[in-house]
Amino acid sequence: MEERSQRRKKKRKLKKWVKVVAGLMAFLVIAAGSVGAYAFVKLNNASKEAHVSLARGEQSVKRIKEFDPGKDSFSVLLLGIDAREKNGETVDQARSDANVLVTFNRKEKTAKMLSIPRDAYVNIPGHGYDKFTHAHAYGGVDLTVKTVEEMLDIPVDYVVESNFTAFEDVVNELNGVKVTVKSDKVIQQIKKDTKGKVVLQKGTHTLDGEEALAYVRTRKADSDLLRGQRQMEVLSAIIDKSKSLSSIPAYDDIVDTMGQNLKMNLSLKDAIGLFPFITSLKSVESIQLTGYDYEPAGVYYFKLNQQKLQEVKKELQNDLGV
């Protein structure tokens, strides 16, 4: 049915894009706030370890004019990778389980976040129509970027890839994040999910990493829409907390974690340059694609509503000024 939510029989994992954004925000905060030779050297080493170059070069082919990262609106593709060593997969062979494109409008000081369903039925250049998640398995980050650019007809300026081990650490390094818990059903479901390890109370509280993780991952208490709102609440809390450099008491462990678990074409210079703008954002809006379940020959896909896709394309193009 049109507009029906994408459903799977297997247990869904945590919305991993929250972790990716958390890691990126922490990187930007620490990059901008580092002082002293030791701090700079440590962060610079982590940045070099995390840095990857795209085969296309620094600028997207979708950019007609030369891209000025200090002045132009820009986009960041956030990828959450499920690389399982037990299957002998390398990171490039793994599928992308979380796929979020974020556009940043310089003039308006706003951001828009678009989650791309992993099972979306899209054209993967050189491979034909398949699940979006397979683009990464076929050609790593380069092919994933090409697929997004063709699908949305916009430039992907930066890409950040994570294997999701740092969420709890990031929240804990921020000394927790403030969240308002409203639902008794959510409280009871979290208690059940964690077998009593996490017990929340109604009201506004500062959640540690384990509590925040439980809050964003529980899925049986309410709808997908309300779960998405909880995830956006935590993400917004992370961004707000990250604006205060004093909220990070020690960065050694988190910098090490980022170096090992993030891959990006952002340099340390890029990160420091972007920090003031990102932390001055007036709003972060979440936009959504729609579609329906599609199962030719018994294989599940999520077929996108083409009218909605065209609307999203235009919205993102306007946001980037392309």
UniProtKB/Swiss-Prot annotation:
GO terms for molecular function: transferase activity. It is an enzyme of class 2 (transferase). Keywords: Cell membrane, Cell wall biogenesis/degradation, Membrane, Signal-anchor, Transferase, Transmembrane, Transmembrane helix. One of its GO terms (cellular component) is plasma membrane. Residues 41-322 are extracellular. Disruption phenotype: Single mutant has no effect on cell growth or morphology under normal growth conditions. Triple disruption of tagTUV genes is not viable. May catalyze the final step in cell wall teichoic acid biosynthesis, the transfer of the anionic cell wall polymers (APs) from their lipid-linked precursor to the cell wall peptidoglycan (PG). This is Polyisoprenyl-teichoic acid--peptidoglycan teichoic acid transferase TagT. It comes from Bacillus subtilis (strain 168).
